[in-house]
Amino acid sequence: AAFFEACGRRMASSAFRKMISVPQLLQSLRFGLVECLWITVGMTSSSDLEQIESRIVSLVKDFAFLHADDSAASSCRPIADMVAKQAVTSSEGGKRLRALLTLDSFRAFASEDVRERDFDALLDLACAVEVFQTGALVHDDIIDDSDLRRGKPSAHRAFSTGTHSEAIGHGLGIMLGDMLATASVDIADKVASKLTHGSDVVAALLNMHREVEIGQVLDLAVELNPLDDPDELVEASLNVFRWKTASYTTIAPLEFGMLAAGIGKDDARKQALAVGLPLGLAFQLADDLLDVVGSSSNTGKPVGGDIREGKRTVLLADAINAANDTQRRELIDMWEADSRSETQVKRAIELFEQTGAIERSRGRIADLWNESKTAIETLSLSEYHESLLIEACSRFVPSIHVQTRA
């Protein structure tokens, strides 16, 4: 149906209201087919999402729940089951951007026969990235002392409620995050033999783990940075984004797709960095911006969460840089306090707006997105596959956050 709709649109155009030659008709049918393929093969987000969701649940259940031959005291099984159920709950929802990018990177670079032969294995690899992310978010929520994740109680909060113990709840949250991180490696390892460059894929996954772990260390270190040097804070924050966010959000998914498509590890890494690094930075800047201009119904988290936590962000640094003396002192005093009231959260957002920090962030996002698109255009892809990859990457940079650059 999509094919005939695509052809119909072309035949309804002015060119088709005139007599055309057979070659011209065939060319238009070919373009109609390309449009159809875009709808049904390249950008099948809804179909991909259904497969990703069901497969993640299956993979997580298989790993997290005790098996029949697992020995565990009957008195302890309820807690083990609680953790396994939470593993599934924590894995539900989300945009699945990383998995979708893994699939579309593979589609953009793989030959048709490889796409058909290896898709199921690649689907599991894409799910492995999402499972890892869930584990990282569980740990992140403990570090940030967050109450909510995707509109539901964060894992450690759910455990604390279920066990009536905050200490045990935090401990179980740490173990759940570890379990999901291990599950991601297990999933990738099981499909490696079915993928081109499978051993390189597993090595890239382990490197991704390492980079995120280093990124979390650096993220905590940034919180000790003084606020009187906003330029240094910007540099340090962007460096954290590279390690903690871009590494597994954009760089690794692109790299996995390229490796599985048959590209050698050195070229895959170089190309994934060229496209994925600016894209990942833009994504995190957009996420930070959403924290102050979004809504809790969209994010699943309260607006101004970073402000409440007193996080040192690029937005904050840009605001301090552009503020007058009074505004600068007000911002620094807020962030140096032990906590911030709801009135102060609203005031901080006002100052971000008044100092131009929000527009500065939109400008950064636009520049980084243009850098990523330019890198894609150098990859010698066909017009169709280049468009596919650009569209896949555009999911990470919602248009609301990108201002037009002259």
Role assignments for model-derived ranges:
Residues 149-177, 229-246, 296-322, 336-337, ...:
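Divalent-cation-assisted or electrostatically stabilized phosphate/pyrophosphate-binding catalytic cores
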Residues 69-76, 90-98, 174-182, 189-293:
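All-alpha helical catalytic cores of prenyl diphosphate-utilizing isoprenoid enzymes
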Residues 12-13:
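Hydrophobic, low-acid, alpha-helix-prone terminal segments
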Residues 6, 24:
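Detector for the Zn2+-coordinating histidines of canonical Cys2His2
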Residues 347-406:
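C-terminal charged capping/lid subdomain of soluble metabolic enzymes
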Residues 3-4, 16, 31:
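Aromatic (phenylalanine/tyrosine) cluster motif
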Residues 122-147, 206-213, 255-258, 267-297, ...:
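Active-site alpha-helical segments that house and flank conserved acidic catalytic motifs
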Residues 29, 33-129, 134, 138, ...:
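Conserved N-terminal diphosphate/IPP-binding helix and adjacent helical/loop segment
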